A protein has these predicted regions:
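Catalytic cores of DNA base-excision repair glycosylases
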Residues: 2-213
Length: 213
């Protein structure tokens, strides 16, 4: 949405949330890259809070890719049984561990990550951002899917890949690595389903706020 009769300078408009949230760690309470990959896969269609709850006990049993690669599905399942779609995710985790074998073999490019079962573009973008890799895309989680259209940045769609594609078209590559999580944190804290607009650092440039006031 164009609020000002010309193409919006979104990089400038969004700079307050980039400043506010830049380099803030993802809410998944991982301690290393192996844990991050496992937790990102488990968190699909589930909550970060739930995955954080089950993770400590899981990683006591499976501290690395090597240990995970030699387990079997029936042994793994009870340890992730409270996770949504846990049976499918167990298959993914074991297959990935058998392919990768060791923690140091975990890939860190978009193509290599998305070649693994259970890792789509959103998950790959999270892994790459948290690993300080050059961005090849923009994180589009459920918060970004809700917030980006609301503020007028993109048109509305529930498809995360379409959201990411639109964001890539309107935002400079220099901010790809951080802007997805910045919008996500805004959505988690302020731009909730019932938004706290008066607290928002970018309400002056928000289509929703303009329409409501």
């Amino acid at each position: 949405m164009d609020l000002f009769g010309e193409t919006p300078d979104w990089a400038t408009y969004l700079s307050p949330i980039l400043t506010k949230y830049k380099n803030r760690k993802h809410p998944l309470a991982y301690e290393n890259l192996y844990q991050l990959v496992v937790m990102v896969i488990l968190s699909a269609q589930d909550s970060d809070a739930n995955i954080n709850t089950i993770a400590p006990a899981l990683f006591e049993i499976y501290p690395d890719m090597e240990r995970l690669s030699v387990t079997n599905r029936e042994v793994l399942l009870p340890n992730i049984s409270t996770v949504r779609n846990f049976r499918t995710k167990a298959n993914w985790l074991i297959e990935i561990a058998q392919i990768i074998e060791k923690n140091e073999n975990i890939p860190l490019t978009m193509n290599a990550l998305t070649a693994l079962k259970g890792i789509g573009r959103k998950s790959a973008n999270v892994i790459m951002r948290e690993s300080n890799q050059p961005a090849e895309g923009i994180i589009a989680d459920l918060h970004v899917i809700r917030v980006a259209p609301r503020i007028g940045l993109i048109s509305e769609t529930k498809d995360g890949n379409k959201v990411e594609k639109q964001l890539i078209q309107v935002l400079p590559k220099s901010i790809w690595g951080e802007i997805g999580m910045a919008i996500s944190f805004l959505g988690r804290e302020i731009c909730r389903p019932k938004p706290k607009c008066d607290l928002c650092p970018i309400n002056n440039f928000c289509a929703y706020y303009a329409n409501e006031n």
